[in-house]
Structures are given as C-alpha cells and as structure tokens.
Amino acid sequence: MTEVGPSSESTDAAKPASRRRLRRWLRWSAVLALVLPVGVGALFGARLDRDPSLVSSPLIGQPAAERTVPYLEQDGAMSLSDLRGQVVVVNFWASWCVACREEHPALNAAAAAYRDAGVEFIGVVYQDRPSSAIAFLDEMGRSENYRYVTDPESRLAIDFGVFGVPETFFLDETGTIAAKITGASTLPLLSGVLDEMLAGRTPTPSTNTGPVQEAPDE
C-alpha cells in the first residue's frame, strides 16, 4: 500500500499561517517585554516608595487617651483631659533615641514660640529610666512651656500606637488627635501644623520624616 503524505500544495498553504502566528507571538512578546517591567515597577513603587506623608494614621480624628501619668521631676500626675480647650503637642521621646536629640531644640523653640498662643507641650518619656531622662534634659535643656511625664509600663504609648520614638501628636481643643509626625520634628513642621490648627484649619494629618528607634534590649 502506498502511503500518501501531505501534498506540496497543502504544505505551502500552511507556511503563511505559521509565519503569521510566529509574527503575532513575537509582537506580543515584545509588548509584554515592555509592559511587564513598567507594571511591576509601578506596583512595587507604589508599595515601597510611596510618600508616607500621604498616609494618614488611623488615630487621626479619634479622641486621645485620658490616661493619668506621673510627672518626671515633681510630685503629682496629669491627664490629657486636664488640657481640654487648648491645643496640645504630645511628644514621645527617650534619652537613648538619636533622633530625639536632633529634634529637641526644635521642640523647645516651638514651645517658647507658642506659649502666648496657649499651646501646651507634653514630653512623654518612653521606655527609659527617669534618671537617664533627667540627665538628658540637664544636658539638652528644658522649656518652661513643657510638662515632662513618665509612662509606667508604656500604657500611654500603647494607647497612641507608639512602637518607637520620636513620635509627636497634635490634639485640638476637644482632645481629638488632629495630626502626627513620625520621626524627628523640625521647627517648620511644628509651626506648620500649629499655625493651621490655631487658624481653625485642618493640618496635614500625617508626616514621616524618618524611621523611629525602638527601645534597646536591657
């Protein structure tokens, strides 16, 4: 029996179709080669390089905790609820924190500048020995318009969602958290938020100036 194979005519007819499929595949491969890196880059860029100042803290717009905390250098204690009716700046700091040392002059300057405006500044010692915190203030200086308090067992820090320092929160006259700075504060940043709040406007809710520092292991 004679085996019948494909005719030369049918083979020739299949060649253009095969070439069309090959060209189509190459064209789509070229498109994907261009699109995929852009898409992946955009995805990772959105996740890794997005501006954290545009991401609001979930605490913004929420009432601040009313926990009572003891003063660092004097007898007695205070609660943030004692300061209702005033704009309040709450700064979490520690003597072992490098960025806290960097921002300290700016906080002191802001406390002095906004004293007549009735702004209260609270410095909350975070996971630090009182003696070390006092030594820090002896070296770096204190502001008269500042209340320095301790935070036993970090309960106030937990209420504010603090896991490292420095972090600074701004409370409006109703005791609501209006804004937050993560990382070292600067005088322009502090003034920008306070000027907006004192004028009755909504400040930038969340600004990130750098990483925070966790407490060292003892």
Which role does the model predict for each range below?
Residues V89-V90, F121:
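Hydrophobic beta-strand anchors of alpha/beta hydrolase catalytic cores
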Residues M1-E66, G210-E218:
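N-terminal targeting signals for export/organelle localization
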Residues N91-C97, Y126:
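Aromatic-flanked redox-active Cys/Sec active sites in thiol-based oxidoreductases
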